[in-house]
Amino acid sequence: MSKILLAGRRILKSKKFVVFGGATLIGAGLYYIDATNEDRFRRQMQNHFGITQTAHADILTELNKRPSSALPPRSELIKSLKEEEYDILVIGGGATGAGVALDSTTRGLKTALVEYDDYSSGTSSRSTKLIHGGVRYLQAAIFGLDLEQYRMVKEALFERANLLEIAPHLSYPLPIMLPVYKLWQVPYFWFGIKMYDFVSGKRVLKNSYFITKAQALERFPMLKKESLKGAIIYYDGQHNDARMNLGIVLTAIRHGAKAANHVKVEKLLKNENGKLCGARVKDMITGAEWNIRAKCVVNATGPFTDSIRMMADPDTTPICLPSAGVHIVLPGYYSPFNTGLLDPSTSDGRVIFFLPWEKMTVAGTTDASSELTFSPSPHNRDIEFILSEIRNYLGKDVSVRRGDVMSAWSGLRPLVRDPNKKDTKSLARNHIIEVSESGLVTIAGGKWTTYRHMAEETVDAAIKAHNLEPKNGCVTPGLLLDGAHNYDPLLYIHLVQDYGLEVDVAQHLANTYGDRAFVVARMCKMTGKRWPIVGHRLHEEFPYLEAEVYYAIREYACTAIDVIARRMRIAFLNTYAAHEVLEKVVQIMGKELNWSSAECRKQLEIARNFIDREMGQEARMQSVSEVALNLTKEEMQTAKDRFNQLDRDRKGHITVNDIRRHFRDHGEKIDERLLHELLNEVDLNKNGELELAEFFQLYSGLKNGQIAQNRLVRYLDELQPVSVNRSGGGI
C-alpha cells in the first residue's frame, strides 16, 4: 500500500495532477449541477397528466398484483389484431418495442405490437448481457466536460437499479475485476470507479474496492502475473437478455396489449390526408394478411429503422448506420468465482468484457460497419481478435485456443444520426425520437439498459403528436415483470422439495421463469427413477427440460429456433449441444402444433442452418481451413493410415457410407443423423465428401490447438460418445 501512496504523491507533483485533480473538481461539479435529477423525476411523476404521488402508488400497487389468468393463445391475439382498432401500433418486438407496448398499455391506451421474426430475435438477444451505466461514458463526461454524457450515465444507473428490482429472477449484481498494471493507474482507476459508485447514489449495487495482487490472483488465477499491481472490483448488473425481452412482452400482454410475433408489416396505411392510420400485415406462419387499424404507428425496429421510415416516406433521408458486434462463448472455467474481467483499452481502443453467464463465459465485443441483414453471422477474424485480446490479459501458462469457442454470434447495433441536427455526419450519443409529417413516431438508438426510459419518452411523443387520451401517466418504474411477483432467491428449494427436481434444474427454472417455474414443474413427467422424481432433460449436460418446450409454446414459440435460441439459450451456449437437442425439440413441437412430417423436416433444416451460420459453426470451419499444415512425417503417416482405414475402396475421399461401414465392422450402431453431422463438421468444402487434404487439415488443427476436439476423431479413436461441454466445443 505504501507504494501506492508514493505513486499518489508523484501524481500530485506531476502534470497528471492537473488532469486528475481537475477531473475531481469537474466530477463534483457535474454531480452538483445534476444532483436534482431524482427529485425532478419524482416531480414529473407527480405532475404527469395530473397524477398525484398517492394515485401513482395506488395504480402501481394494483398493476403489481400477480395476474392469475393464463396467457391468451396466439390465435386469440391475432383475432383481436384483425378486428379491433388501436391507439398505438408498435412495429418491432425487441427490448424497445416491447417497452413501448408495456408503457402504452399500462397508461390505459389500446395497444398492439407486431414483430416480423420472434421477440428478441435481433439485437436484443445478442448483447453483452450487461445492465450497466457505462463506465467509459462517465470517463468521457469527466475528462471531456460533457454534461450530456454525464446525464446519460445518471439515467442508465437509475434504469439499472429499476431492472434489477422489477425482474430479480432474470437479473443480478455481478462483480467485475479491473486489473491494474501501472502504479499510477491505481489511484486513477480507483477514482473513476468511485465516481461511478458516487453517481449511482442510493442505487449503488455494492461499493467498489481495491484488492492486492495476491488477492487478485487468488480470485482470478489465470490472470497475467507480470507487472500486476492489484485490481479494482466494481459491480454492474447482468441479465438473460432474450428472456428479459420476452418478460416485457408477456407483461404487456397480461396488462391488455395484443402482440404477435412472426407477423410482417407489408406496408403502412394512410388516410385521405396522408396521415398514417395503420398497417397491412402478414402472418408468416399461416400466410394470412389483414389490416391493423391504429391512430398512431410507432417504429421500434432497431437496425431496420429506415426500412419502416421509407414505407412512410420513400424520400426520407436514412439515419441508421448498422454496426456489427461479435461475442464468443468459452467454457465456464475461464471466469472463476463468478467474477467478470474488464480490459479497459484494447488494441483498437475499445473495451472488452469477459463475463460469466449461464455457467459459461461470454467475451466481447468488436465493432465494425455492417450490411443490413436479418441473419448476421460472426466472421473468424473477429473471433480471433477477441481471443487475441483475452490472451493479452491471461498468464502465459494459459492456452486460449480457437477450439475453446463453444458458440459465437454477431449482433447489429442501431447507431443513428439525429435528423434534427444540421450536422448530419455526427452520430447521436443517445437515442433519438422523430415524428414524421405522416405521423410515424420513430424511436432509434439507445441501449438495452435504458429501454424503459426510451419507451416512456416515445409514448409521451406519441400522445402529444396524435392527441391520445391516456388514463394515467407512466407507471413502468417499479412495475414488476412476468415471474417476479412471488419470486425469492430460495424459490428453487421449494421446487426441489415439492416436485423432486434436481438442484441445478430447479435453480435454472427459478432463474428463468421466476414464480412461473411452478407451472413448468407441474408440466414435467415422471422419470421412473428414485431421483430425480420428475423432469426429463433435453441434454444430459444442460438443465433444460422437455417440459420447457411445451411451456415455450405457451410463450408464443412458433419455430424450433424460437425455442433453442430465445426461450432456452442452448444455441448461444454450445452449438453441438444445440444440434443434439434439436430433433427432440422438433418432435415435441410437431406433436403440439400438428406439424406435418414435411414441416418437421423443414424446421430441422432451418434450425441447423441457423446454428451453423449465425451461431458460429461456419466461422469455426473457416478457422480450420486457415490452419497451416504443421504435421511431422510420422504424424502425416498416422493421419493417412486412419484415412485409408475408412477409404477402403481407395476413392480418394470418405463418404457417410464409409463411416457407417467402419462403425458397423466394429460392432457399433450409430444414429444416421449423427453420421451426417460427423461428416459435415469436417467437410470443409461442403461437397459431401472428406478428401485427404481436409483430413490433414483436421489433424493439423488438433495438434496446434486451433481445434480443441473433434467428434469424428474421438469416435474413431474410442468408438464412444464424448462430452460436448469439454475443453472446447469441437472444431
Predicted regions and their residues:
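Core beta-strand elements of the Rossmann-like FAD/NAD(P) dinucleotide-binding domain
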Residues: E84-Y86, I285-C296
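N-terminal Rossmann-like FAD-binding beta1-loop-alpha1 element of flavoenzymes
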Residues: Y86-L113
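C-terminal accessory subdomains/tails of enzymes that are appended
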Residues: K3-I4, D117, L170, M177, ...
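Glycine-rich active-site loop/strand segments that organize a redox cofactor
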Residues: S120-K154
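Short hydrophobic core segments
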Residues: V90-I91, I292-G302
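A conserved short coil-to-beta-strand element within the FAD-binding core of flavoproteins
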Residues: N261-C277
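Glycine-rich FAD pyrophosphate-binding loop
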Residues: T105-S127
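Extreme N-terminal leader/targeting segments of oxidoreductases
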Residues: S2-I88, T106
